[in-house]
Amino acid sequence: MQNYQQPLRVGVGGPVGSGKTALLEALCKAMRDHYQIAVVTNDIYTKEDQRILTEAGALEPERIVGVETGGCPHTAIREDASMNLAAVEALAKKFGNLEVIFVESGGDNLSATFSPELADLTIYVIDVAEGEKIPRKGGPGITKSDFLVINKTDLAPYVGASLEVMERDTERMRPERPWTFSNLKKGEGLQAVIDFIVERGMLGVRG
């Protein structure tokens, strides 16, 4: 008989360098005093994101597990999510009372999606530095994720990106689906992500 609770599993995806790990660090630090949290990171050949989160003090080290996927990062979160499912189950059993487990995908493209067996909610992170055209390119990450984060808004003037254009295209590509602009260096947009997780994940507001 299962003697541990099933946590809410939140998948966090997005291209390399978009700010997935920075978002996870910020989420963990903001939520850890109110909820029981753990993280599973995915890297192809290393456990670099696990190391970054651990050294940043996002959570206690034993709450952060790194998975080396090898090969294509899409497969490890979609077609064959067995390594990630095993890591999630191991963490849930170890702590018994986990309420949220974040699963960070390896760097991927706009077509990557999480298996519904692995993630109850999905957050997709893109960044302004990739260009204002990214939202209108579509792909499941843009159109199907439960929540979209457009990060690094502070870079817009330097890359010639119009936030107004990005907002218009985002609203067109994912009507009725929530999203936010963010500048995680300053904490901008973070609360919108937390509110989404708490509300959609039915966690209950605390703190």
Curated annotation (Swiss-Prot):
Record-level GO BP terms: urea catabolic process
Entries under Pfam families matching the protein: cobW
Main location as per UniProt: cytoplasm
Transmembrane segments: none
Compartments where found: Cytoplasm
Domain of life: Bacteria
Database matches in InterPro entries: CobW/HypB/UreG_nucleotide-bd, P-loop_NTPase, UreG
GO cellular component: cytoplasm
Residues that coordinate or bind GTP: 14-21
SUPFAM superfamilies listed in its UniProt record: P-loop containing nucleoside triphosphate hydrolases
Gene Ontology MF, one: GTPase activity
Coiled-coil ranges from the UniProt annotation: none
Keyword annotations from UniProtKB, A to Z: Chaperone, Cytoplasm, GTP-binding, Nickel insertion, Nucleotide-binding
Quaternary structure note: Homodimer. UreD, UreF and UreG form a complex that acts as a GTP-hydrolysis-dependent molecular chaperone, activating the urease apoprotein by helping to assemble the nickel containing metallocenter of UreC. The UreE protein probably delivers the nickel.
Family affiliation: Belongs to the SIMIBI class G3E GTPase family. UreG subfamily.
Role, per record: Facilitates the functional incorporation of the urease nickel metallocenter. This process requires GTP hydrolysis, probably effectuated by UreG.
Protein name: Urease accessory protein UreG
Gene name linked to the record: ureG
